[in-house]
Amino acid sequence: MDYNRMSSFLEYPLCNRGPSAYSAPTSFPPCSAPAVDSYAGESRYGGGLPSSALQQNSGYPVQQPPSSLGVSFPSPAPSGYAPAACNPSYGPSQYYSVGQSEGDGSYFHPSSYGAQLGGLPDSYGAGGVGSGPYPPPQPPYGTEQTATFASAYDLLSEDKESPCSSEPSTLTPRTFDWMKVKRNPPKTAKVSELGLGAPGGLRTNFTTRQLTELEKEFHFNKYLSRARRVEIAATLELNETQVKIWFQNRRMKQKKREREGGRMPAGPPGCPKEAAGDASDQSACTSPEASPSSITS
């Protein structure tokens, strides 16, 4: 069985676990570091005693690493030589300490991170900026990014606000062509070419001359023919519809007066009484002043 291979972990002592770790001297092979100093600081073997006490007292047996095979190992180095300290030019000991004295000669492994953080210099402090070899940690998004975002937001806000402030003073409500069209156009008294006015048109105001000529024509003939209506309309500067409506209203007014008076309507001279009550549009009698064109059979 190769015992040298099994005990190879003793040939490479740990030099990066603390400021007071030990390594083998340069004039001796790597296995010259005593195993007593490597495990003296742990409570399992040395009970936390300093290494100087173990070296001065030769009565204590040399502690050996545990072995499942039950084989004892000799001491790899004589007790007359003191172990050499680790080179301080490398390792984490030059940046921070763990709060353990160098003369203790043992490893110090705290159970939590509180002691390690308490012993760190200013360069590793919470918020302090020191002159250590490493720069202080920076947040992922620093003040430069925040300032950049703020300046970009200000530019965007200025671009949005500048046109809005000038638009209300310059813009005027625009009127389109479809807005000019009236949904309910006002009624006008304009008569079409055929003489038919719009339904529900305005009331016609007749002049005194027009009323006198219409009353004179109604006295001689209550019912007019189409030709006579056209002639009277042309003479009085009216249309045929206006003359027709006036004669209808005048006949209704005459009948109302006769009903109120209780007398029989008298026909024009030279006409029989039967023809006076005829409600037909054609007239069976003629007046002396009537034109020949108004005579109908």
Curated annotation (Swiss-Prot):
Q: Which molecular function GO terms apply here?
A: DNA binding; DNA-binding transcription activator activity, RNA polymerase II-specific; protein domain specific binding; RNA polymerase II cis-regulatory region sequence-specific DNA binding; sequence-specific DNA binding
Localisation per UniProt entry: Nucleus
Task: Locate the motif Antp-type hexapeptide.
Answer: 175-180
Name the GO cellular-component terms.
nucleoplasm
What is the predominant subcellular site recorded for this chain?
A: nucleus
- Is NAD tagged as a keyword? no
DNA-binding residues: 199-258
Which keywords belong to this entry? Developmental protein, DNA-binding, Homeobox, Nucleus, Transcription, Transcription regulation
Which residues does the annotated region (Disordered) include?
A: 38-74, 124-144, 251-297
Query: Among the record's GO biological process terms, what is one?
Result: positive regulation of transcription by RNA polymerase II
Bias (Polar residues) ranges: 52-70, 280-297
Record's SUPFAM superfamilies?
Homeodomain-like
Keyword Chaperone in record: no
Q: What does this protein do?
A: Sequence-specific transcription factor which is part of a developmental regulatory system that provides cells with specific positional identities on the anterior-posterior axis. Acts on the anterior body structures.
> What family name appears in the similarity comment?
Belongs to the Antp homeobox family. Labial subfamily.
Q: What PANTHER family does UniProt report for this protein, alphabetically? A: HOMEOBOX PROTEIN HOX-B1, HOMEOBOX PROTEIN ROUGH-RELATED
User: By what name is this protein known?
Assistant: Homeobox protein Hox-B1
- Its source organism is Mus musculus
